[in-house]
Amino acid sequence: MKLVLQRVKEASVSIDGKIAGAINQGLLLLVGVGPDDNAEDLAYAVRKIVNMRIFSDADGKMNQSIQDIKGSILSVSQFTLYADTKKGNRPAFTGAAKPDLASQLYDSFNEQLAEFVPVERGVFGADMQVSLINDGPVTIILDTKCH
């Protein structure tokens, strides 16, 4: 899995002008699923995300997790994280998982996250508009195959 984590003051995702999900303080996750991803990748990503200390404590030090601050997650599927830009000017997305597998793993990922923190989400495969107010900004790239 490839994920982009953005610390946000607020974020929302809309489809056809209607809000599908919205959060206040927490994390916006852009989630890409690869063809070799499995339950171990999901567990690793969930564990890292819910425990990562990227929120400020009273002293302004990044020392608190999303659980500590009682934050929420907005999860948005994002197959374009697997873009291959080596040849030409048009990216190829053949490195992303096929939609059936990606949808199943994305759903499972969100269900596992929801065991720890509230999770709002977009609609898998939909054309979505994402709005956010970055906090920091703090943006982290997480690749479950690089640990």
Curated annotation (Swiss-Prot):
User: Please, which domain of life does this record's source organism belong to?
Assistant: Bacteria
- Annotated GO CC locations: cytoplasm
Is tRNA-binding among the key words of this record? yes
Reaction catalysed?
Answer: glycyl-tRNA(Ala) + H2O = tRNA(Ala) + glycine + H(+); a D-aminoacyl-tRNA + H2O = a tRNA + a D-alpha-amino acid + H(+)
Q: Which EC number(s) does the record attach to this protein? A: 3.1.1.96
Sorted alphabetically, the keyword list is: Cytoplasm, Hydrolase, RNA-binding, tRNA-binding
Subcellular location(s) of the protein: Cytoplasm
A single MF term (Gene Ontology): tRNA binding
Q: Where is the motif named Gly-cisPro motif, important for rejection of L-amino acids mapped on this chain?
A: 136-137
GO biological process annotation, one example: D-amino acid catabolic process
- Does this UniProt record's set of keywords contain Hydrolase? yes
Q: Which Pfam families match?
A: Tyr_Deacylase
SUPFAM superfamilies reported for this sequence: DTD-like
Question: Which Gene3D superfamilies does the UniProt entry name for this protein?
Answer: D-tyrosyl-tRNA(Tyr) deacylase
> What does the record note on quaternary structure?
Homodimer.
Share the domain note from the entry.
Answer: A Gly-cisPro motif from one monomer fits into the active site of the other monomer to allow specific chiral rejection of L-amino acids.
UniProt record similarity statement: Belongs to the DTD family.
**Its biological function?**
An aminoacyl-tRNA editing enzyme that deacylates mischarged D-aminoacyl-tRNAs. Also deacylates mischarged glycyl-tRNA(Ala), protecting cells against glycine mischarging by AlaRS. Acts via tRNA-based rather than protein-based catalysis; rejects L-amino acids rather than detecting D-amino acids in the active site. By recycling D-aminoacyl-tRNA to D-amino acids and free tRNA molecules, this enzyme counteracts the toxicity associated with the formation of D-aminoacyl-tRNA entities in vivo and helps enforce protein L-homochirality.
Name of the protein in question: D-aminoacyl-tRNA deacylase
